[in-house]
Amino acid sequence: MTVGKSSKMLQHIDYRMRCILQDGRIFIGTFKAFDKHMNLILCDCDEFRKIKPKNSKQAEREEKRVLGLVLLRGENLVSMTVEGPPPKDTGIARVPLAGAAGGPGIGRAAGRGIPAGVPMPQAPAGLAGPVRGVGGPSQQVMTPQGRGTVAAAAAAATASIAGAPTQYPPGRGGPPPPMGRGAPPPGMMGPPPGMRPPMGPPMGIPPGRGTPMGMPPPGMRPPPPGMRGLL
């Protein structure tokens, strides 16, 4: 429904209105909306109805009921008059809630409850993030106190276990040569180029019976040719 700004209905939005229905009931509430069929929406609405007595000697009595938000059908509406100006506390409902009591606190938006003169709390230097802009704090400032020594010791232990190269002091020579199957011991000449070194018994097994034939131990004569099969 297109309604002009000069409409009388729009001028009474948020007013306290008295609406009388065909059956005699009276609804008093804050006028919030309407449509082309004159269907009304009232909030904080109260209903007043007159109850007829059973005997003619008794007077009529009026009964009040608190309803809250009400949608009135336009086909039942008889009259509509202004009851009062808009309430000042439009953001607070007039309908009392059961067991609800107002507290001493004040509702405020986030970030507006701190006075202007109070400085904002800041994080410690070791826990603060980098500064926005060109640069930030140094590495010493960013490292938490009491953790640098432990981290350095853990890194050194990890490097030694992983087999990192050991630094030898100057003047004492380099590391000893690796011992392998093809490398001769210190002080002995290796085999000439093109020849494989002789195969000896496996390490950890002493020469004796059941071992493969190889070079005899030093100081012992080799057996005769016919006696080699008996050993």
UniProtKB/Swiss-Prot annotation:
One cellular-component annotation, GO: U2 snRNP
Expression (tissue specificity): Heart, and less in brain, pituitary and liver.
Residue positions, PTM Omega-N-methylarginine: R108, R112, R147, R172
InterPro entries, alphabetized: LSM_dom_sf, Sm, Sm_dom_euk/arc, snRNP-assoc_SmB/SmN
Segments forming domain Sm: 4-86
Spans annotated as Disordered: 163-231
RNA-binding recorded as keyword: yes
PTM text: Methylated by PRMT5. Arg-108 and Arg-112 are dimethylated, probably to asymmetric dimethylarginine.
Record PTM Dimethylated arginine, positions in chain: R108, R112
UniProt region (Repeat-rich region), positions on chain: 175-228
GO function terms (MF aspect): histone pre-mRNA DCP binding; RNA binding; snRNP binding; telomerase RNA binding; U1 snRNP binding; U2 snRNP binding
Residues annotated with Asymmetric dimethylarginine modification: R108, R112
Annotated family: Belongs to the snRNP SmB/SmN family.
Protein name: Small nuclear ribonucleoprotein-associated protein B
Provenance organism: Rattus norvegicus
Gene: Snrpb
